[in-house]
A protein has these predicted regions:
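Single conserved hydrophobic/aromatic residue that forms the stacking wall/gate
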Residues: 1-11
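Solvent-exposed soluble domains appended to multi-pass membrane proteins
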Residues: 13-378
Length: 378
């Protein structure tokens, strides 16, 4: 990337989420400093699909319901187009890469800061569940090395239920996950519980028949299971001190002609729900992306996030200019309230730019170059 080192470091320093005063002015969204946290990664839940209707019927009625009930992040973006890179962004606040995945480099990924490790220092237990194979893309090694205590996946479940290409369908897995959350809630320690769904992954094989389009039908199935899970937890004693974070692992190219590098391809939902919230039915318009979850959540709990260089507190005072950032195959996009810039690094070409001239191009170059230099040092 053709950006001078001194200028790059100056820009990068301005974009750091852990600068002094980063949490100044942060509004309090939680009733408790130590809520139990449920973090659900929703496979391929692109924003365009969430907003879709078929003959007037919403594809994701439960997500639409939760959007109205909880804290809704209107301008939120995935950092990548793959689950493994999205997981690292959400769980470690570390930016995705264009042509590699740090998750597959265990000695390097083990050095990343992580939400599980930060909460573990505060006495939190942690458990993560997935209905498929957590050895895929080295997920299990990554999860253990970044502080998750307990992993539950397909090999542990041994269910009398059919499996798809990727594992057990979401309907049976959310029931097990509900059991796990309620069991953790009966213990004295606070907890962090994570779930990665899978039924909305292609080839979209689900025990469900609502829409003719296989993609939309699978998305509707997963939405229905998340709706059942949230409604179950709402009726459980665990709900009173529970914060549920619903966020996609990445988006999906829908409509089917949506360009792979378009900002809309990477726009995803994020919703906060639960009895631990002091506020509800709130819309957050700030531009942000998956890497900002760690700092935002830790700041709400009054905990430090100094380790997370790239993660910005969405509600904090610094950096003053908030934006969403994503990577595609050797390129990046930066989106803020003024417009968007999409850059192809291979061709050294700005593919699209809207809004007034800004520093978005330099921000993106600094983020991408700094990410790779950081990985090289680990």
């Amino acid at each position: 990337l053709s950006i001078r080192r001194q200028r790059q470091m100056c820009i990068r320093d301005r974009l750091r989420g852990n600068r002094p005063g980063a949490d100044a002015g942060t509004p309090r969204l939680l009733r408790s400093d130590r809520p139990n946290v449920v973090l659900i990664l929703l496979e391929s839940f692109g924003r365009t699909i969430m907003d879709e209707t078929v003959n007037g019927e919403p594809v994701m009625p439960n997500m639409q319901r939760f959007k109205r009930e909880g804290v809704w992040f209107e301008n939120f973006f995935a950092n990548s187009f793959r689950t493994d890179r999205g997981q690292v962004a959400v769980l470690c606040g570390f930016p995705a890469q264009t042509t590699m995945s740090i998750m597959k480099l265990p000695r390097k990924s083990a050095t990343l800061p992580s939400l599980a490790r930060s909460l573990g220092r505060e006495g939190y237990r942690s458990a993560f569940m997935y209905g498929g194979d957590l050895n895929f893309t080295n997920q299990a090694s990554f999860m253990y090395s970044t502080g998750w205590e307990k992993l539950i996946w397909q090999k542990d479940m041994q269910l009398d239920a059919p499996t798809s290409k990727w594992g057990y369908a979401d309907d049976v897995v959310v029931d097990l996950f509900g059991d796990e959350v309620e069991a953790l809630g009966r213990e004295e320690q606070p907890f962090l519980a994570g779930l990665l769904t899978l039924s909305s992954h292609e080839p979209f094989e689900v025990p469900f028949a609502k829409f003719d389009d296989k993609l939309l039908n699978a998305m509707a199935f997963s939405d229905a299971q998340i709706g059942r899970l949230i409604d179950r937890l709402r009726e459980s004693p665990v709900w009173d001190n529970l914060l549920v974070v619903l966020v996609a692992d990445h988006g999906y190219p829908y409509p089917y002609d949506l360009a792979y590098n378009a900002p809309l391809r990477h726009r995803i939902p994020m919703i906060w729900l639960g009895g631990a919230l002091a506020t509800a039915s709130r819309t957050v318009d700030t531009y942000a992306s998956q890497i900002d979850i760690c700092a935002t959540l830790l700041a709400q709990m009054g905990l430090p996030h100094d380790e997370f260089d790239y993660s910005k507190n969405i509600f904090g005072a610094t950096p003053p200019h908030k934006f969403g950032y994503y990577c595609f195959s050797d390129g990046f996009g930066v989106i803020d309230a003024d417009g968007e810039t999409v850059y192809d690094n291979t061709g050294e070409t700005v593919l699209s730019q809207t809004g007034p001239q800004s520093e978005r191009l330099e921000w993106g170059k600094a983020m991408l170059q700094t990410t790779y230099e950081d990985i090289g040092r680990r």
